[in-house]
């Protein structure tokens, strides 16, 4: 079977009977064995849980589960409590993590745990466990160290979480400067869980007593622990998830997509299109511009995007409307010569979507490579000038000031409004011209996640220069606002969030 893991997060109350049974089978076959410390007759027996155990979890509206499937096979699950305390603080406690033996060390556990602990605006993240690797993952995901002295200051909050976790006995928590233990009445064979990290955490959290587990928590107010390698891994992971982040934008519900007809009016005039013109839509997303052209009778239409999910949506709309558009999955940084076009549209910040400046310039080169001589393109990019004027979070070099990014407020802007110009939620790196955001996605049928999104923004002079240096004559480059592309704004007008460029291939 090909390994193509698929993830999702749902409320436990939404688990089907089939999923409940799959969780039971996964746990019972892969969790471990009893130590026999509470009952010698159980020693060596597999620890098993019935489907009813998981069904009971569904009675608590604060219980969630993240699942990993490969086809129909459940590879892993992470159950967790997500609770808002009376003071409004959000907390997450992972109550169970299991991964199929045959699929361990492939990053499944980390992805599942990130869905529970990866939201940076929470007050506390934690679990009870005998597995040192899981404690290390908690520290890695939250950028903080598990410290018994800090845990001891928050026993009231932890007690409120214990009230919703049947196995956690808040009356038997032992925390001091050398230990952090909680009685869970659980007796797994601890020796088989030992690894190279075990002694490290025994020295910090204490020796695990019979029936107890480590109580491991980190908290929002703790100092963050920065590591260069970890930093690079976080940014690289987020870059790899860029496709997923853009595909999860609920574009049909976002206000900036309401002006499609007006935008196509502009494109038709700027490119002098006739019904026989061949048009390429680069970074088409759900295909709204290509669909509008098809609706108007244009027949020779092609649209590229790197997200199969967005293209599936676009194809469905085209089929429903009876439109013929050639949708293809392509990375627009690397378009090979083949079909040539009379006009290309590349709208809403496709150029600028990547951290590396050269990647964004590669899109410009790709456009030139598929555009007929004398053909025109219409491109929009995010306006760095307004971004810099309005920035309230800025550093000269984010790599030298990582805390600025780690402490940046998170939002669900991409999933909800698409307003990526809200200065409260972005950090400007003035040396690289990268704009960082922490984007959260929840309860959309996919894995709950927080990603660090970095986009490159251009000044008007910079985008003109980029096109002129790559084989184009720039015909116009204007500051514009939504729904008024034919009414350019003056420099300094804070309504001009986009720079709209029309260029002709030389």
Kindly give the residue locations of the regions a language model identified.
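A short acidic, Gly/Pro-enriched loop at the edge of an enzyme's catalytic core
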Residues: 336-343
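Conserved acetyl-CoA-binding loop-helix of GNAT-fold acetyltransferases
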Residues: 99, 105-117
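SAM-dependent methyltransferase
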Residues: 378-466
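Conserved class I S-adenosyl-L-methionine
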Residues: 237-274
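Class I SAM-dependent methyltransferase SAM/SAH-binding core
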Residues: 290-334
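A short glycine-rich, Lys/Arg-flanked "PGG" loop and its adjoining helix->strand segment in the class I
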Residues: 361-373
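Terminal substrate-recognition subdomain of acyl/acetyltransferases
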Residues: 1-20, 24-35, 118-236, 240
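A conserved beta-strand-loop-helix scaffold within acyl/acetyltransferase catalytic domains
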Residues: 30-94
């Amino acid at each position: 079977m090909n390994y193509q893991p698929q993830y999702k997060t749902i409320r436990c109350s939404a688990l089907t009977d089939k999923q409940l049974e799959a969780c039971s089978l996964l746990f019972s076959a892969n969790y471990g064995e009893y130590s026999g410390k509470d009952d010698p007759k159980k020693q060596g027996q597999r620890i098993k849980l019935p489907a009813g155990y998981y069904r009971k979890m569904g009675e608590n509206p604060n219980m969630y589960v993240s699942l990993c499937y490969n086809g129909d096979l459940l590879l892993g699950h992470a159950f967790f409590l997500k609770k808002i305390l009376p003071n409004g603080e959000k907390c997450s406690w992972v109550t169970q993590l299991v991964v199929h033996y045959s699929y361990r060390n492939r990053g499944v556990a980390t992805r599942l745990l990130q869905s529970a602990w990866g939201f940076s605006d929470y007050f506390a993240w934690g679990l009870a466990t005998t597995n040192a690797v899981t404690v290390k993952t908690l520290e890695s995901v939250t950028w903080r160290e598990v410290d018994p002295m800090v845990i001891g200051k928050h026993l009231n909050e932890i007690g409120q979480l214990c009230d919703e976790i049947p196995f956690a006995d808040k009356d038997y928590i032992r925390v001091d400067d050398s230990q952090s233990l909680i009685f869970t009445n659980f007796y797994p064979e601890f020796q088989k869980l030992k690894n190279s990290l075990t002694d490290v955490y025994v020295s910090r959290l204490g020796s695990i007593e019979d029936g107890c587990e480590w109580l491991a928590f980190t908290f929002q107010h703790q100092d963050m622990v920065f590591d260069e390698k970890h930093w690079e891994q976080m940014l690289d992971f987020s870059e790899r998830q860029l496709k997923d982040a853009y595909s999860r934008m609920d574009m049909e519900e976002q206000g900036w997509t309401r002006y499609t007809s007006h935008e196509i009016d502009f494109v038709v005039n700027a490119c002098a299109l006739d019904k026989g013109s061949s048009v390429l839509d680069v970074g088409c997303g759900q295909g709204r511009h290509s669909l509008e052209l098809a609706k108007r009778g244009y027949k020779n239409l092609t649209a590229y995007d790197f997200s199969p999910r967005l293209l599936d949506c676009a194809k469905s709309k085209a089929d429903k409307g009876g439109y013929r558009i050639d949708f293809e999955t392509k990375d627009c940084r690397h378009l090979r010569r083949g079909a040539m076009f009379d006009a290309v549209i590349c709208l809403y910040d496709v150029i600028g979507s990547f951290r590396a400046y050269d990647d964004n310039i590669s899109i410009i080169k790709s456009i030139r490579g598929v555009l007929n001589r004398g053909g025109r393109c219409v491109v929009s990019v995010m306006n760095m000038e307004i971004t810099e004027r309005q920035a309230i979070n800025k550093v000269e070099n984010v790599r030298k000031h990582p805390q600025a990014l780690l402490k940046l407020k998170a939002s669900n802007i991409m999933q909800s409004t698409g307003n990526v110009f809200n200065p409260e939620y972005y950090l400007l790196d003035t040396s690289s011209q990268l704009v960082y955001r922490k984007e959260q996605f929840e309860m959309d049928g996919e894995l709950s996640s927080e990603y660090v999104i970095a986009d490159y923004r251009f000044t008007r002079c910079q985008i003109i220069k980029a096109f002129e240096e790559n084989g184009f004559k720039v015909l116009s480059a204007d500051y514009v606002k939504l729904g008024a592309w034919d009414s350019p704004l003056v420099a300094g007008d804070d309504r001009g969030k986009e720079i709209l460029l029309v260029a002709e291939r030389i």
